[in-house]
């Protein structure tokens, strides 16, 4: 059930409506395609917000994300902290162990009878894009963690991960790294 409090979360709302009943698994689409912060909040509320945050932090501990701390589910709080290294580890874990979540980020759109969610991902059309997520906060500026399949030789490829914080132009920075 989507709450008024979840909808009050800063940012776009993915077309969610107060009182709407929606499966938690469907909330991943506005969250990952459109950066719906209220989608993140609604997921956390479904499981009890504090319990959810505790689980996020315990998962970070389990994955040895030593410098990552979650203070809110959307990543908006300036008290959320992480490092490029930790973001990279987390993306690798999701790619290997929760591939269905990672795969959502490769879709251009997802539609239900009530919603049409469209990707705002700048890298979606980049050759070899395997998935990822970008974001923005005043503290971290433009951020991104993405995975690409890059040609290694005429017949082989290699997955390359890119994680950036504090970028002023993540699209340019990622392009430069991919060309390196």
Locations of the language-model features?
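Conserved catalytic neighborhood of penicillin-recognizing serine enzymes
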Residues: 8-41, 117-132, 151
